[in-house]
């Protein structure tokens, strides 16, 4: 059973001003070798450092980066530029054809998009003529998965957990009922664009959420991945050119090959099943 925790806007840097260096983040630190920029492999842990630029000029963006993660295709090169925040027509078609969610459902796997959404948000995005969904949520709908409202028994808040450890443990318990579970955390990128002190709080909450997830001690393999940098440099409001972390922890971690790009993840996940 694989659990894909996507963290929007988490890059890597050696700058000592970064919250990745300033804050006490023991769980994230353990999963990433202290936010290292050097890959490592340990029992039950594979850590890789991924290029988010994809050979295309400009700052990496969410829609193209997430599409690359989910399809294994270089979405930015396909377009000739990076695209964000929401996937437009060409990327929508790619997600409909090749995303992990669509592929997994077609193979008969049990798949869950675990994010819980406010009812008013669901009404807005599902009633819009334009796509207002992220690549992860768009791919979920393309696969026929429901976008769950907050309060649904299988829905998980993507951030802002009142009790992060308990939320992480609950997420693990839900995920053990599925072959492939997705959760999209967008809080770091959101606050990273706003020069907000909330960013530190959200990083600590994410660390505690992961601690609760791992302490559940279930036979799950966690995949933690990001699409582009942002939160690691909170002294400005833009995305960064920095590489991003990929951490795989659990029974399947020993099967992770060398990976260097966002496009390397989806093909490996498909080979697992």
Question: Where are the model-predicted features located?
Answer:
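Residue-level preference for the first positions of well-ordered beta-strands
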Residues: 1-3, 178-182, 221
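Active-site nucleophile/metal-coordination loop of metallo-enzymes that catalyze phosphate/sulfate
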Residues: 11-103, 119-129, 249-254, 258-262, ...
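Short active-site-adjacent structural elements
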Residues: 13-15, 191-192, 231-236, 255-256
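Metal-dependent active-site segment of extracytoplasmic phospho-/sulfohydrolases and closely related
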Residues: 4-12, 202-239, 269
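Catalytic cores of processing enzymes, dominated by hydrolases/peptidases
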Residues: 138, 143-154, 217-251
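Active-site-proximal segments of metal-dependent phosphoesterases and phosphodiesterases across multiple
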Residues: 190-208
């Amino acid at each position: 059973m694989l659990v894909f925790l996507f963290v929007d806007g988490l890059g890597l840097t050696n700058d000592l001003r970064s919250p990745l260096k300033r804050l006490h983040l023991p769980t994230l630190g353990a999963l990433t070798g202290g936010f290292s920029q050097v890959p490592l492999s340990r029992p039950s842990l594979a850590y890789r450092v991924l290029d988010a630029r994809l050979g295309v000029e400009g700052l990496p963006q969410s829609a193209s980066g997430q599409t690359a993660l989910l399809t294994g295709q270089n979405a930015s090169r396909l377009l000739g530029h990076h695209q964000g925040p929401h996937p437009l027509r060409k990327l929508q078609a790619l997600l409909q054809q090749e995303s992990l969610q669509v592929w997994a459902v077609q193979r008969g796997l049990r798949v869950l998009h675990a994010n819980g959404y406010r009812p008013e948000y669901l009404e807005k995005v599902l009633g819009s003529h334009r796509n207002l969904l992220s690549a992860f949520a768009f791919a979920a709908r393309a696969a026929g998965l429901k976008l769950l409202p907050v309060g649904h028994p299988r829905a998980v808040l993507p951030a802002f957990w009142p009790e992060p450890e308990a939320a992480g443990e609950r997420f693990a318990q839900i995920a053990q009922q599925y072959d492939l579970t997705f959760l999209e955390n967008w809080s770091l990128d959101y606050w990273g664009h706003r020069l907000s002190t909330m960013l530190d709080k959200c990083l600590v909450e994410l660390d505690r959420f992961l601690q609760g997830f791992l302490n559940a001690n279930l036979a799950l393999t966690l995949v933690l991945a990001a699409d582009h940098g942002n939160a690691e440099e909170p002294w400005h409001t833009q995305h960064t050119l920095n590489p991003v972390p990929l951490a795989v922890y659990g029974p399947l971690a020993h099967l992770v090959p060398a990976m260097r790009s966002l496009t390397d993840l989806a093909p490996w996940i498909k080979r697992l099943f």
